[in-house]
Curated annotation (Swiss-Prot):
One of its GO terms (molecular function) is structural constituent of ribosome. Pfam families: Ribosomal_L44. It comes from the Eukaryota. Keywords: Ribonucleoprotein, Ribosomal protein. InterPro entries: Ribosomal_eL44 (IPR000552), Ribosomal_LSU_eL42 (IPR053708), Ribosomal_zn-bd (IPR011332). The gene is RPL36AA. The keyword Ribosomal protein applies. It comes from Arabidopsis thaliana. This is Large ribosomal subunit protein eL42z/eL42y. Belongs to the eukaryotic ribosomal protein eL42 family. Residues 28-57 are annotated as: Disordered.
Length: 105
């Protein structure tokens, strides 16, 4: 289980900052797929009418986890940067810290 603190002091690349500042940490989430994207328009056009499924449906999923991407927002200039971390099954931001010699559960 990966537990990340809610704030992190790290370098800000923005041209106004260019120094170490406090950053607010959130988890990156994928946005909603656009209906206006060219591939989606083409797919919908091909699917319409008679004839069933026209393109292959992908079934051979290889991975069981996704790489976690942290979204860091600078507290002074509000600039966002993203930082990937390793794959993990359980991820939490700002959870209880594990004490010495104690179990978390």
């Amino acid at each position: 289980m990966v537990n990340i603190p809610k704030t992190k002091n790290t370098y800000c690349k923005n041209k106004e900052c260019k120094k170490h500042t406090l950053h607010k940490v959130t988890q990156y989430k994928k946005g909603k797929d656009s209906l206006a994207a060219q591939g989606k328009r083409r797919y919908d056009r091909k699917q319409s009418g008679y004839g069933g499924q026209t393109k292959p449906v992908f079934h051979k999923k290889a991975k069981t986890t996704k790489k976690i991407v942290l979204r860091l927002q600078c507290q002074s200039c509000k600039h966002f940067s993203q930082r990937p971390i390793k794959r993990c099954k359980h991820f939490e931001i700002g959870g209880d810290k594990k004490g010495k010699g104690t179990s978390l559960f």
